[in-house]
Amino acid sequence: MKTIIVLLLLTIVAAAVVESSPKARRQTECQIKNDCQRYCQSVKECKYGKCYCNYAG
């Protein structure tokens, strides 16, 4: 039982580290809408530091 709990905690910690890695954040980080043009063909908005793109469909 302790082994399962330890493995679960390690998985959660590993996921948190990967999510907060600088490279992952750098990919869509923005201050203004124009910062998103290198990530999106059609920029929807920059909100809370994240780029949102318009997708055809």
UniProtKB/Swiss-Prot annotation:
Disulfide bonds: C30-C46, C36-C51, C40-C53
Molecular-function GO terms, alphabetical: potassium channel regulator activity; toxin activity
UniProt comment concerning the protein's domains: Has the structural arrangement of an alpha-helix connected to antiparallel beta-sheets by disulfide bonds (CS-alpha/beta).
Tissue spec. comment: Expressed by the venom gland.
Stretch forming the signal peptide: 1-26
UniProt KW Signal keyword: yes
Name used for this protein in its record: Potassium channel toxin alpha-KTx 17.2
Keyword Disulfide bond assigned: yes
The protein's role, per its UniProt record: Inhibits voltage-gated potassium channels.
A GO CC annotation given for this chain: extracellular region
Similarity remark: Belongs to the short scorpion toxin superfamily. Potassium channel inhibitor family. Alpha-KTx 17 subfamily.
Compartment(s) of residence: Secreted
Location, primary (coarse class): secreted
Keywords: Disulfide bond, Ion channel impairing toxin, Neurotoxin, Potassium channel impairing toxin, Secreted, Signal, Toxin
